Design a protein with these regions (language model features):
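N-terminal "arm"/small-domain region of PLP-dependent enzymes with the aminotransferase-like
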Residues: 2-76, 80, 86-87
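Conserved C-terminal alpha-helix-loop-beta "cap" of PLP-dependent enzymes
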Residues: 16-27, 276-277, 281, 287, ...
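Short catalytic/ligand-binding loop motif for oxyanion handling, primarily in non-cytosolic enzymes
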Residues: 41-46, 105-107, 143, 190-193, ...
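Conserved core of the PLP fold type I
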Residues: 67-212, 223-246, 320
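Conserved core segment of the aminotransferase class I/II
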Residues: 99, 240-321, 333-334
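Hydrophobic "anchor" residues on beta-strands that sit immediately upstream
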Residues: 181, 215-216, 252
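Glycine-centered flexible beta-alpha turn that most often forms the glycine-rich phosphate-binding loop
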Residues: 219
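Conserved glycine-rich beta-strand-loop-beta hairpin in the small C-terminal domain of fold type I
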Residues: 314-328, 340-356, 362-365
Length: 367
């Protein structure tokens, strides 16, 4: 197809007229479409319905270490749930805390805790004149909503094909002690579907922050969300890299089963260094006696182990893959060669991002 920039004004006006007519035809159909991003379909939710049968009134709800999951206790989760999520997050079990149903909730609490009580003895952020966060863009709007909610100044960092602009990240983090963190979705990122390169992860692990309480908020939400068995992105494990680089405490790693089992009814986890986890437990001991152990046990008995999760995710992929391929086929057929936008073909996650030309975003959304 001929690029729009190579068409004459008359040709563009004629094209515009035809496209507007097509647009009116579609509008006249009165379609009611759920355009929510990252929301699993009913077919995907049905994949986990067997979980509802794993715990019945006649089932023993005692977990492996003898704790009765119906009762109080177990501040940081039952052992088998910690093992399941640890394997999914590629970290040792002892470096994991299991929380409730939402990793976003855990991230919110982590920022709130830093605001009110500081991190590992540092000054609470609320007592500082200025607190700043790096925000790779485009990124996850709910991450940015958290920092905005707490009045934290957000600094945009452009995304590249290999992750955030690390030259910019390194320069800012090393020179400004007011910068306390960065949001990251390192694998099949929201919304572009980019996975951080080896070099990007190495550079993150070797950051030299001016702030001793700087933390990388590593939201690995799509760690097992591949579309293909034979074509999968690989992401280096950040916790070990930080430890090898002499920065063991610099990262908080988050994940959950929200897009594996039931969104809103899954289990969430954080992985971090021993020192970070003990700092977090000091607040948790006041905040809660423990999270929902019955739900943790239900997940463990349904999936069994990491291999069960892997097999389960293949079923998700079978449902999602045709949808991704359809969108990509239509984009290429209708817009390929026109030079009016760009996109990538992700190997996993939930998103395809269309990057329009400068100045076009508002007009596109307005339609």
């Amino acid at each position: 197809m001929t690029a729009y920039k190579d068409l004459s004004k008359e040709e563009l006006l004629e094209l515009k007229s035809g496209l507007e007519a097509q647009f009116e035809e579609v509008k006249a159909k009165g379609l009611k479409l759920d355009m929510s991003r990252g929301k699993p379909s009913a077919d995907q939710l049905n994949l986990s319905m067997g979980m509802m049968d794993t715990l019945t009134s006649g089932v023993d709800l005692t977990c492996e270490d003898g704790v009765d999951c119906r009762n109080y206790g177990g501040l940081d989760g039952i052992d088998e749930a910690k093992q399941l999520l640890a394997d999914m997050m590629e970290v040792p079990k002892d470096n994991v805390i299991i929380f409730g149903n939402s990793s976003l909730n855990v991230m919110y609490d982590t920022v709130a805790r830093a605001m009110t009580h500081g991190i590992m003895g540092s000054t609470p952020w609320c007592k500082l004149d200025k607190v700043k966060f790096l925000c790779p863009v485009p990124g996850y709007d709910r991450h940015f909503a958290i920092t905005e909610h707490f009045g934290i100044e957000m600094i945009n960092v452009p995304m590249t094909s290999t992750g955030p602009d690390m030259d910019m990240v390194e320069k800012l983090v090393s020179s400004d002690p007011a910068i306390k963190g960065i949001w990251c979705v390192p694998k099949y990122s929201n919304p572009q579907g980019i996975t951080y390169s080896d070099e990007t992860v190495f550079r993150f692990a070797n950051l030299k922050p001016a702030a001793e309480d700087f933390r990388i908020f590593w939201d690995n939400a799509y760690c097992v969300h591949h579309l293909y068995e034979d074509k999968q992105d690989y992401l280096i494990e950040i916790l070990m890299e930080c430890k090898k680089a002499g920065n063991p405490d610099m990262v908080y790693k988050f994940s959950s089963t929200s897009k594996i089992s039931f969104p809103g009814s899954g289990i969430a986890a954080m992985a971090a260094s021993d020192a970070n986890l003990e700092d977090i437990r000091s607040t948790m001991r006041v905040q809660t006696i423990g999270h929902d152990k019955v739900n943790q046990l239900r997940h463990v008995r349904f999936f069994g182990d990491i291999h069960g999760i892997v097999e389960h995710m293949k079923k998700h992929a079978d449902i999602l893959r045709p949808k991704f391929e359809t969108v990509l086929e239509v984009l290429e057929r209708e817009l390929g060669g026109l030079e009016i936008g760009s996109w990538i073909a992700p190997r996993g996650g939930y998103f395809i991002s269309f990057d329009a030309l400068d100045g076009c975003r508002n007009a596109i959304v307005a339609k």
